[in-house]
Amino acid sequence: MECTLPKEFLDRMRLELGDEYDDFIESYNRSNYKGLRINPLKLNDKLINTIKSRYSIRPVPWCPTGYYYGEDERPGRDVLHHAGAYYIQEPSAMIVGELAGDIRNRKVLDLCAAPGGKTSHLAGIMNGTGLLVANEIIPKRAEILSQNVERMGIRNCIVTNEGPDKLSNRFINYFDCIVVDTPCSGEGMMRRDETARREWSKDNVRMCAERGQDILESAHRMLKSGGRLVYSTCTFAPEEDEDAIELFISKHPEYRVLRETLKKTEGSLEEDGWPSNGNGCYGDKVYRLWPHKLKGEGHFAAVLIKGDAETESGDAGKGKKNGNGMTNGLNKEFENFSKALKTKLSPDNIVFKGDRLMLSPVCNINLSGIRVLRHGLILGENKKNRFEPDHALAMALKPEEFKTVLDIDSSTDEGMDACVRYLSGESLNLNNDNMSGKSINLYEDGVRTDNSKGWVLCCVDGISMGWGKMNNGIIKNHYPKGLRIMR
């Protein structure tokens, strides 16, 4: 593999790396390392073994849910990917979520969140507890972020499309943890991205560094005392990395840099490498992931703690309802549907947004004036005076949380064909001999059955992938048209 790198970039890297420069340049001649991160929200006993049987995976040393996969393998095309079983993510970027610490039952903000890798990582750690706000300033990227939040089955996430400065005027001293994976000059992407090589310049590095400081200022206003700020980039430029941390702390001396101890993943190989220290006065406390020292494209990360004592969060309009509450007509229809749900939903958190019924995160906040793409979990909507469950609800449910479940074993040809047919939008006829084998099973209240009527949670290998509606042995497909695959 050959790529032409900008001369000024090479000159700077030669000065920065010294004797390591040749090894760094040599790393550009090898193939990309690719990774996937298992989704804990979908994890079951069978899933890891199923993935291992299909792909030559091995652990990423700094991320217990992360795995490398083979260069010629395509897990992004797998039915399991459509079902949210894992997220495709560059291996070195997986360190960021691991540095967030124990964020269960906390208020967490992913400030520059698209396309959703860090958000899904944080959500997996939170395991449905607390509040996760995922923000993206660019509308099209915010839509992709929202789609990935849905695919990964995240219940407790609010997706916003705002500038950091506007959010900082609302959420003053509010969050326990903020992740800032700031837009950068992308030097860690240059080996695999021609656009990153073409657009690189010293001026762009300078502009990114200045923008990064503005974003950090917004994050500072939103982080409560005692809170944790995780700052990261996918660039090697000191102006955007160590220098950015030094400049920020010079303006806000109440912050200290914390070197979090990472535990090496069981089964990982010594040859896969490990994050290094950085440079400058905080060099021994920040993380540099160099492409010539480990198996990844490269990343920078630092953990900053604001002050010493943890304080109460600001209220951010706390206590104001978002929506107009339950109305009697749809309330009755939803109550009828909810009899099939085997998980309890708090009535205090169920609100309407137009015709949509939403399950808001436990932490209720006032979002008036904020562009919101997804306000927690979309339960469903009123269609012609009947309740129709949303795809997001299906993706968030486990098989044991719904009355009627179709589970398909994708390890067989018969099962894989049924999965592809479902994801293509076809109805599934369980009366057909090809649909009645051991690979395709219908359950009602956990007991295998041959027929049922009404809504069915369609699953693959024990994880949900969408809704169907059954009558006389035929499951009508309710997989969203915009997500359907071409056969």
Question: What do these predicted regions represent?
Answer:
Residues 103-104, 168-179:
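A short acidic, Gly/Pro-enriched loop at the edge of an enzyme's catalytic core
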Residues 127, 223-225:
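Helix-to-beta-strand junctions that scaffold the AdoMet/dcAdoMet cofactor pocket
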Residues 140, 177-218, 234-241:
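Mobile active-site "lid"/loop adjacent to the S-adenosyl-L-methionine
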Residues 105-114:
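Conserved class I S-adenosyl-L-methionine
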Residues 115-128:
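Conserved SAM-binding loop of SAM-dependent methyltransferases across substrates and taxa
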Residues 137-172:
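S-adenosyl-L-methionine
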Residues 1-16, 20-52, 297-300, 307-487:
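Polybasic, low-complexity RNA-engagement segments
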Residues 175, 228, 236-358:
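Class I S-adenosyl-L-methionine
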